[in-house]
Amino acid sequence: MIKKIFITGILLIVILLFVRPKYKLGMIPENPRLEKIICRQLEKNELTEEDLLNVDHLFVNGKYGRVKTLVGIERLKNLEILSIYPGKMISLEPITNLTKLTAIGIARRNKLTDLQLIGQITTLTDISLRDMPNIDISFLENLRNLNDIYIADCGITNIDCLKNLNPEEVHLWNNNIESLPDLSNWTKIKKLDLSGNPITKNRDIVDENGDVYMSYFKKDLE
């Protein structure tokens, strides 16, 4: 009896590991790989138009589907949060059609080299970029509604494009920032973390942990 139960258990594990669900695709014919990811997230084998409208967050994991583009994502008309980690992504089009998007996160060495389209999504309040070496973040200057900014392990050398924004939290871990621009416009700032950066100028405003003394901003406001 015990042997029979053991064998049955092994068979169930094998089935769970190797039998993949069969998806009935067709709602996003131009990008079936993206549709599969949505099916997996919603735990459904087939999507309806209502399902697409109910998706308010999407996690595009490169381990599933190897999505290279976001073509068809505009069908998710109520999408608010988009995470891409990691993957083969080479293009963000047509991301600018996501009119309700408020947060985006991209990480782990995607093949994306041009993030300028993100600069057109003025509804964004949160952005996270991690492990994206040598990216150009100049597009951030257009995102005046950003409250939280996370940029880590991206090799950026300056944050001049952020000086005219007014964020609440900025985390810039492990980059190559050596100096800071005038940040007197940051009247709402609560946290600025520069740990892991070779700050050479304005060193007097950064403590040993890489945190900027908030008194620096208060002084600018007096």
Language-model-derived ranges and their functions:
Residues L11-V19:
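Hydrophobic h-region of N-terminal signal peptides that target proteins for export
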